[in-house]
Amino acid sequence: MNCGPGSNDKKKFVKKNLKIVRRKIGKNTKDIFLLHQVHSNKFIFLEKNKKIPKKSPIVDAIITNQEKLPIAVLTADCVPILLCDNKLKFIAAIHSGWKSAYKGIISKVIKFMVKKGCNKNNIIAAIGPCISQKNYEV
């Protein structure tokens, strides 16, 4: 089920798939903030009380301190990484393939969160499933 706004699939099918996902998690069609992922080390920061872009930015991670803003990254073989600082109410979602990881996207996101006031000892990470080296040749 492809939900990627930056994919080569027909847009009408991507929109249909997104509607299914959003309905299942109880969110409006426009609620979840998605990215146009390109295997980079770039991210976007959606700051509290600031306007949210209408178009998906071309980046591979999102950081926000906006409450009630669902964020997501889409992965197949890449690693989804979620970060959270409960004290400052910051969250991040990272799309980390081998290219993004090599370019330092994970440390870049954490350094930015620390720059914004997060204590690195308060940041909790959740790492999602990905393909294994045994099953994938780079």
Give names to the regions the model predicted.
Residues 1-138:
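Active-site microenvironment for binding and transforming phosphate-containing groups
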